[in-house]
């Protein structure tokens, strides 16, 4: 009887030992699984934050471009590309200007005013040519305005070079107002459709990248939950 009881106790001890080993293995697997899930969740959270940050940055860039470049592009009336022929180019007078010489320091100077009159080939009108849209805003009497500086002779030399270039190339493309409200044309558009496209391209790529990151993380989470449900059903 003693021998039988001892054998039974030894057998029970072995079974308990096996159960403890299996339990330890199972606990170890569960711990590894929890660590993996925690690491994946942390990585997913970082990816979502990155995607949201990219979308917020792109929205801010859209806003800044909208109040600067896009508004100027929409307000520009010189939208029709045309051909201009030079009629007259001359330096008419000088205007006063001011330039910065340091923090809280401004000095007065002068710049020569270059006037260029052209013939618009499509209508035959005699119109004043401006370098860009901003030239008209600075001084409506001048076609080209050099940068205001301390050296007037340098500004005069630059304007003379521009004048000689016009005399050398008397036929050139320009931009006019198709509705005819502006009795002037411009030589170069600061806010063309090409400039607008390149300015909006990178914010759009950033927005698309942010949306793609968030969508991929959400899709991964959905597929993970779906696989877990399928495993539970199969059990």
UniProtKB/Swiss-Prot annotation:
Gene3D superfamilies: KCNMB2, ball/chain domain. N-glycosylated. Pfam families: CaKB, KcnmB2_inactiv. Signal peptide: none annotated. GO terms for cellular component: voltage-gated potassium channel complex. Residues 1-45 are annotated as: Ball and chain. The keyword Transmembrane helix applies. The keyword Flavoprotein does not apply. Interacts with KCNMA1 tetramer. There are probably 4 molecules of KCMNB2 per KCNMA1 tetramer. This is Calcium-activated potassium channel subunit beta-2. It comes from Mus musculus (Mouse).
């Amino acid at each position: 009887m003693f021998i039988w009881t001892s054998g039974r106790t030894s057998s029970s001890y072995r079974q308990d030992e096996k159960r403890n080993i299996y339990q330890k293995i199972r606990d170890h697997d569960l711990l590894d699984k929890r660590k993996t899930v925690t690491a994946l969740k942390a990585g997913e959270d970082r990816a979502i934050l990155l995607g949201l940050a990219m979308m917020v940055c792109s929205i801010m860039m859209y806003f800044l471009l909208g109040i600067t470049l896009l508004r100027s592009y929409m307000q520009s009336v010189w939208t029709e590309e045309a051909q201009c022929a030079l009629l007259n180019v001359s330096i008419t007078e000088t205007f006063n200007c001011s330039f910065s010489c340091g923090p809280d320091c401004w000095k007065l100077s002068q710049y020569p005013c270059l006037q260029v009159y052209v013939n618009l080939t499509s209508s035959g009108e005699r119109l004043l040519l401006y370098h860009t849209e901003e030239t008209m805003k600075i001084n409506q009497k001048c076609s080209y305005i050099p940068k205001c500086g301390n050296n007037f002779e340098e500004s005069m030399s630059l304007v003379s070079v521009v004048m000689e270039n016009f005399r050398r190339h008397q036929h050139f493309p320009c931009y006019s107002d198709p509705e005819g409200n502006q009795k002037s044309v411009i030589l170069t558009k600061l806010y063309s459709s090409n400039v607008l496209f390149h300015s909006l391209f990178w914010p759009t790529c950033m927005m698309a990248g942010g949306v793609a990151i968030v969508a991929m993380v959400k899709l991964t989470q959905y597929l993970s939950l779906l696989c877990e449900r399928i495993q539970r059903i199969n059990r």
